[in-house]
Amino acid sequence: MKYRKFIILVLSILIILPVSTLDGHHIANADDDSPKKLKYKENSALALNYHRVRKANFLNNFIYFFSSSKEIKNYSVSQSQFESQIKWLKSHDAKFLTLKEFLYYKKKGKFPKRSVWINFDDMDETIYENAYPILKKYKIPATGFIITGHVGEENFHNLDMISKKELKEMYKTGLWEFETHTHDLHNLSKNNKSKLMKASEATIIKDLNKSEKYLTKNFKKSQKTIAYPYGLMNDDKLPVIKKAGLKYGFSLEEKAVTPNSNDYYIPRILISDDAFEHLIKRWDGFHEKDET
């Protein structure tokens, strides 16, 4: 009887997941989800973006392999996959940068070879439970883009968000920096448009000022950056972003970062297991020989 209930539960999840938007990130994806090889340019860096890091248990693995949900396939990796990716990067002499270092080298016009910046959007509990211990173990710096108005909230678009206490614990390690993912504009309107993209100038500035105040109060000075919800921004809204005092904006795009990358459209590569295998491992920056 218990087995039958379990099967019914799993089947129900598989039916629901493909139509659930969770946090709606899938709208930023192109129709063609197959990863291409990254174009390599000298003097470039990789900004690797993560959203969910799943526990590798039977139920999660079952759902992953049998679900058609883009949220699960494209916006999550398992804990074991995440650790394997970190170990691969270390074995290929990646130079892990903090956000502060990443922005410094970009502004200076010269990235160290094999520069990698690890970052996370939303900051739900899976990051604290499954990614944070691995990064701490290997002493890898990372940046978390927080939806500051929903810290500690349960069931925010089907996600349990990290608490302030947990964020402060992470911050005290010296490995984490936290930036804004808006205060309360990470949402979709009724017609599936980003709330940030539809909001008025006054609403956006008020929201981003609230977020900046939260970050400054709890984590000292921020770097004045934003990860756009769903990775989306356009030129019409950029003057408002600048007026709010933000100096850099991050999108989601399968490109390496160069010093010439637009400061308000800095590309980050959304990491899934497939993306890491096809894009990151094949990036020529990890295979070029050092000058002797």
UniProtKB/Swiss-Prot annotation:
Its main location: secreted. It is found in: Secreted, Cell wall. GO terms for biological process: carbohydrate metabolic process. One of its GO terms (cellular component) is extracellular region. SUPFAM superfamilies: Glycoside hydrolase/deacetylase. In strain COL, the gene icaC is interrupted by a natural frameshift. Belongs to the polysaccharide deacetylase family. This is Poly-beta-1,6-N-acetyl-D-glucosamine N-deacetylase. It comes from Staphylococcus aureus (strain COL).
